[in-house]
Amino acid sequence: MKRIEYKWLALALLWVAFFLQQGTRQIYGPLLGSIQASIGATDVQLGLVSTVFTLVYGLTIPFAGFAADLFSRKWMVVVGVAIFCAGILTSGFVTCIGALVVTYGLVNGFGQPFYYPSSTSLISQLHADTKATALSLLQLGMYGGVIGCSWLAGWFAGLGTEGWRLPFKTLGVLGLLWSLVLALTLKNTQPPQPSQPPQPSQPPQPSQLLFSALRAMFSKPAAVLIALALGMEVYVDVGFKTWMPNYLSETFGVSKASAGLNAVLWHYLGAALGIVVGSRLGDRLVKRIPTVRFWIIGGGLLLGAPFIFLMSRATTYLTCCLAMFLFGVFRGAYDSNNFAAFFDVVEPRYHASAAGFNLMIAFLFGCFSPTVLGWTKAHYSMSTGLATLAGAYFVGFVLLAFASRIYRPQNLSQTNTSK
């Protein structure tokens, strides 16, 4: 039997970790009603838990990316998975909203950032010739985690007032076990060397590395604009995933299990279609049209915005699900080339650190969405709150349109030299 090439084994290992990372994020939304009934909390307090998580994630992720470039990307992934799964596990035992802020918001929010910059940097290096395709396959792990764990959470929520605790405990234990698998199986792949190392005879100092990483991103206006556009997408994504299950249950009267599943199923089925098509187009055309990745991700946000609005105003369950599917198709197109475009701009040696700065900007903006939507629900309606998300997508499109105008082919990172 032919031996599996390591780059595909690494992708599979990181895929499962991404499934767990995103799945543990998604279980919170379908459980809102059960958590509220069990421990008592207002809509704003429930939104605050998600806001604290997103804020801590955004503040931590640049340090996680920098640590990965300075130390070991493998161990950043392993430690990150272990920490956030410990936070998820302990969330299943809390008895008040304050404790949930600590376990889910702080501990979980601190551990999760250590996974993504390191994993995407590793995959970008190992799959230099098929970068968008490999990153898109990784992204499918997110979609699978969100759909599967959302259904699981909704099903457990229907078991009774305390059923909401079981998804936290189950996924927490599974994640801790998977961190051991990663520790034993992942290789400690060394990052590529910078094109102009400061001193070939000695390793760079942390301060030099930090300055170089900051310069690698912030000296490229296109990279900054990509990060700001990602902030618009994260604002939409966090608010959508937090409140959509509750919205479907209250607006259309479906069960918690059905709401938890359908709030993400149709959206991510559409996204899977968009990501497969978008990634192949990006990889095939980028050598002939260097800005094609910008066109794909910008077009995804522009064309997705009308369907977000339709989703929020739908008067029938079928129309709402159809709108979520089409919203997902264009969200998938965005996801398919977002980090590939970013890594084209930034020097490979600093991919993990730059990805951390990128996500910091995005999540510091996106963290406000759950609380804003909770406040809008209390004072107006959740339909109104969801409708405003379409505007964030349009702003993201404008930012990417500017990025495509200022990006030049000579900025393209020479990733093919790094195997």
Describe the residue ranges of each PLM region.
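Juxtamembrane intracellular "pre-TM" segments in multi-pass secondary transporters
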Residues: 1-4, 190-227, 251
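Residue-level signature of mid-helix packing/kink "hotspots" within the transmembrane helices
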Residues: 26, 54-62, 146-147, 267-276, ...
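Extracytoplasmic gate region of multi-pass secondary transporters
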Residues: 28-29, 221-276, 335, 339
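Conserved MFS/SLC helix-loop-helix module at the cytosolic interface between two early adjacent transmembrane helices
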Residues: 59-97
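Primarily marks hydrophobic transmembrane alpha-helices of the MFS/SLC 12-helix fold
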Residues: 77, 291-297
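Cytoplasmic helix-loop-helix junction between adjacent transmembrane helices
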Residues: 102-142
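Helix-loop-helix hairpin linking two adjacent transmembrane segments in secondary transporters
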Residues: 138-188
